[in-house]
């Protein structure tokens, strides 16, 4: 009798874990939609009124807003890849597994197509 109760409790725990796992995607989307508002609690200790840009270096130490600012000041020097053609198909063709390498090479050469 005790063994049967133990099996039932294990089964219910497993069922509960499966239910939680099946709803993880929905819970992630809800958190994003709410802007990571954790039920009124401020988990990180930061004020909600502070723009994320002002605390980005605290969250991600490598984050620098100055890089964007410098690029906006000198737009003529920015490299913009030419995206004139469609994206490559991700299928196994010949000896390559995809055409991503060819696309990257094309973008790096300013969109000038090379004849092979």
UniProtKB/Swiss-Prot annotation:
Task: Determine if DNA repair is one of this entry's keywords.
Answer: no
**Compositionally biased region (Polar residues):** 8-22
Location(s) in or outside the cell: Cytoplasm; Nucleus
Q: Which keywords does the record carry? A: Cytoplasm, Nucleus
Major site of localization recorded for this protein: cytoplasm
The superkingdom listed in its UniProt entry is Eukaryota
Region spans: Disordered = 1-22
Described function:
Mediates the nuclear localization of the ribonucleotide reductase.
- UniProt-recorded name of the protein: Damage-regulated import facilitator 1
